[in-house]
């Protein structure tokens, strides 16, 4: 554990469970409802403090079990951390998914952190700070993941999730550094970037993969254009040249657009990758309280 790399400051976020107990306050006074803890890391890779948000399932405090970790890109308080960790929290209530640790990795300059460098003048003019995805990937590999694994009881099983540019980063990481995570969830990835260069390079990059077991979960909204063209190229590369150990799937979401697809698609992804069997036998007869038939003794008196 690279403890010397980090100056870690814990701060409470708003909403939820799995953190320190709330302090009593006078009646009628507002009190924060704590759902997670935040940490500030003094990153040497990014050369600035970086924020992580961590949600722990309630069972974390009840024993010594170890948990898989889901890393959520764009995982700041005002980004996607709350609604994705909320899916994990709901699953603990309903018992529908495996308990997870959810780590939100905040982004500051998305074009800088989530895209690869291009020399195309139109991209350079429109987004002059772009192109540092390699550095951000080093931040995850050398700082974020070691911090999480050193501080929390993790099982060693990891997943990364993102949407739009964050999903582009997920796909790039899967193709270029596949051993960094076990599971990759990319929702409406912006594969239009740099004229679909990453999708066009996919066949050659896949050919370099080993046979280790990994999962790639892809989804796209009803977007068309170069968004759809890019993911179609990636799908073609996977169909013809997926590594032996890879399980991959694709889910089109024709009823959604780029602004609405993330939350429902994320729920589908988590259900497929971490779902638990229902607590009842779906093939068994319905229990009596769900039956339409009422016994004669239950009929109202006349």
Predicted regions: what they are:
Residues 1-4:
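Positively charged n-region of N-terminal signal peptides that target proteins for export
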Residues 7-16:
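Bacterial N-terminal signal peptides
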Residues 18-21:
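Sec/Tat signal peptide C-region and signal peptidase I cleavage site
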Residues 23-302:
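Non-catalytic cap/lid and distal C-terminal segments of serine-dependent acyl enzymes
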